[in-house]
Regions:
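Alpha-helical transmembrane segments of multi-pass membrane proteins
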Residues: 68-80
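Interfacial helix-start motif at the membrane-water boundary
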Residues: 92-114
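Active-site-surrounding "flap" and adjacent substrate/cofactor-binding loops of secreted or lumenal enzymes
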Residues: 79, 84-99
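Membrane-helix interface/capping segments
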Residues: 114-115, 123
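Short, glycine/alanine-rich hydrophobic alpha-helices that insert into or span membranes
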Residues: 62-69, 113
Length: 291
């Protein structure tokens, strides 16, 4: 009886994570929106009085992620076994879907972000350029944090032990061996960074979109995390911490960018001019702000 309880709990992990992400998709951008009510939602060209960069609500959100990650550690093995069950692994729909969502995330996040930025600059659609650039910034920041942690922690990926040893840590080994870069999940942090950036960016100028964009973006990000577990590349706790890093990266990049519209990167990237050169090409011009 006792040995079956963890299994029952972990079989429900995908549903629990999906429910958590759905709640996050609504609550998290609403929190950001409440902090930004005094901001001009249209662009980053006007500086206004800001709420504190980190708030009590941020602390609650971070604490929830940390608690979920810590609680997941003892259940990592059972969750891995549940998703590696033969009936799950032979499901054709899951096989194709999990592969597709991973490709959309990496390298898809960079391609989509870059395309939105380029189209926004070419068409002089500032909101689209903001969306593409800030989304890409968030993904890059999340990846930077994730990469350092992966290398430092050196946690073995589940397939090394056939999902039996979630405690396989070799600090520093992740910098030299990819098989020891399990914690946290890079695909998940990328997906949640993009989800948070897009959701928070769009709710600045379309507040009601939180009920549409939020569930779509965070739901997709959750699918990415579950796909990494399905492919036996990550433990459940890897996914949860990756989600935390990505969520905060997306939130804070957007908040900082709109709170500091004259920051150097935005002045360069969002004030670049792209015009036809008369020869079938384009001419790109920008100004480099001096210190």
């Amino acid at each position: 009886m006792c040995t079956q309880t963890p299994a029952r709990l972990t079989r429900g992990f995908p549903l629990a994570l999906t429910a958590f992400a759905t709640l996050l998709s609504i609550v998290e951008p609403a929190v950001s929106g409440a902090q930004d009510t005094r901001l001009d939602p249209r662009d980053t060209t006007h500086s206004q009085k800001q709420a504190p960069f980190f708030t009590k609500k941020d602390a609650i959100l971070a604490g929830s992620f940390v608690a979920a990650t810590v609680l997941m550690f003892p259940l990592d093995k059972q969750a891995a076994h549940a998703l590696q069950d033969s009936s799950t692994q032979t499901n054709r729909f899951l096989k194709h879907t999990t592969t597709d969502v991973e490709i959309i995330t990496s390298p898809g996040a960079y391609i989509i972000g870059g395309a939105l930025y380029a189209v926004g600059r070419l068409g002089k659609w500032d909101r689209m350029a903001d969306l593409g650039w800030h989304g890409t910034e968030a993904v890059l920041f999340a990846q930077g944090v994730t990469t350092v942690l992966k290398g430092a922690v050196g946690r073995g990926r589940p397939f090394l032990s056939d999902g039996t040893d979630p405690g396989d840590y070799h600090p520093g080994k992740g910098f030299s061996q990819a098989d020891y870069t399990s914690f946290p999940s890079g695909h998940t942090s990328t997906a949640f960074a993009a989800a948070a950036a897009v959701t928070n960016e769009t709710t600045r100028w379309w507040p009601r979109s939180v009920w549409i964009v939020g569930p779509l973006m965070y739901g997709g990000a959750t699918a990415v995390g579950l796909s990494r577990m399905y492919h036996n590349r990550h433990w459940g706790s890897d996914v949860l911490l990756g989600a935390a890093i990505g969520t905060f990266s997306g939130r804070k990049v957007v908040q900082y960018a709109h709170g500091h519209p004259n920051n150097r990167l935005d002045r360069i990237m969002l004030r670049t001019t792209v015009v036809p050169d008369g020869r079938g090409g384009v001419s790109v011009g920008t100004s480099i702000p001096l210190p």
